[in-house]
Amino acid sequence: MATSREMTEGRALPLIFNFTLPLLLGNLLQQTYSLVDAAIVGRFLGINALASVGASTSVVFLILGFCNGCCGGFGIPVAQKFGARDYVTMRRYVAVSLQLAAVMSVVIAVVTSIYCADILHMMSTPENIFTGAYYYLLVTFIGVPFTFFYNLLSSIIRALGDSKTPFWFLLLSTVLNILLDLFYILVLGWGVAGAAIATVFSQGVSAILCYIYMMRRFDILKTTPAERKFDGALARTLMYIGVPMGLQFSITAIGSIMLQSANNALGTACVAAFTAAMRIKMFFMCPFESLGMAMATYSGQNYGAGKPERIWMGVKASALMMIVYWAFTFCVLMFGARTFALLFVDASELEILKNTELFLHISVSFFPVLGLLCILQYTIQGVGYTNLAMLSGVSEMIARILVSLLAVPAFGYLAVCFGDPTAWIFADAFLIPAFIYVYRRILRMKKN
């Protein structure tokens, strides 16, 4: 039997730290794959092919972000019932979440595939890259069920306190993805569509193997026929938690698309600098996201176990780890931003290098605000208040839209650099009082 891990006993800091490490490695793996995938497409298929993939990225994030958010939400009741040692209800939640995933993923795949071309036309996709973007997007949308199940199974396993098993399946998916990228593009000559097929196929294989492993190795998840029956009440609970988390990702994506569009109007140098800086920033942001994901499981289990005071202990421990990491990252990016920028552009591109440095220096200065955002947002989600977490996403969207419409026309690229930090500040201004409200409420619930 594979080991699940209860996070309701023991010191919070080592528990969260050990749980975070595999999540961090997984997130770093995803960012590394993103870079390699772009390099393969760009170097072997050319600039237009790379632009075709880029033209689809924001829409893919919009749709897959919703799916991934729902999967994370579906794992929260599982974590809560696991923490409460109510294993029968936990298994029923797992069964219903799989049933919901089947219906939702097929509906999303069908609708988005039908309107794929219309979506690209609405985004004013240039004609010279339209065909490549269309096939890349179409294959990605057709593969939504594989992506949905892969992320749902990983979420369920993490809910049981096991963050290592999802990492190994992510590693398998990444290696297979890169190998298939090379095979489909270089050997079969399938072009941009081949890159999308490689991603969908590798996630499909990983999802199937993950399900087989989960059912064979986690005895606690083996269901009876009665436990596998669809339950409307449980389905409503899952949707109540999962859909707001999905919408949170999609809402955030809308604000990011607006900021990207405003930056596009500033010229090639700003676009290139923004692209390079975002890739670097996303890599260094991984620990914050990983800490947040760990807090979702930690808070969910302790909420289910009736130990809300441990949630505050977890927040303090996570904040301490976040500050230590930020101090390290601040030094690295303040003195090494240009070195990282040189991974993307030649040393002669002085304007791009300067703009990349500026973006990274401003972003890293506000990383503690981002770290607190991730910790509080995921903690609130973990105890089931996903609507509040979604509203923090709305706060981010509003901030980015305001920066895009009001600040960028007046201050140019400098305003773009402050777009994300402004969004983080807006979100924290909402999340801090929201967390205080939620924490006090669950303390009162325990007393009553």
Short names for language-model regions:
Residues 14-75, 79, 243-263:
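Signature of the first transmembrane helix
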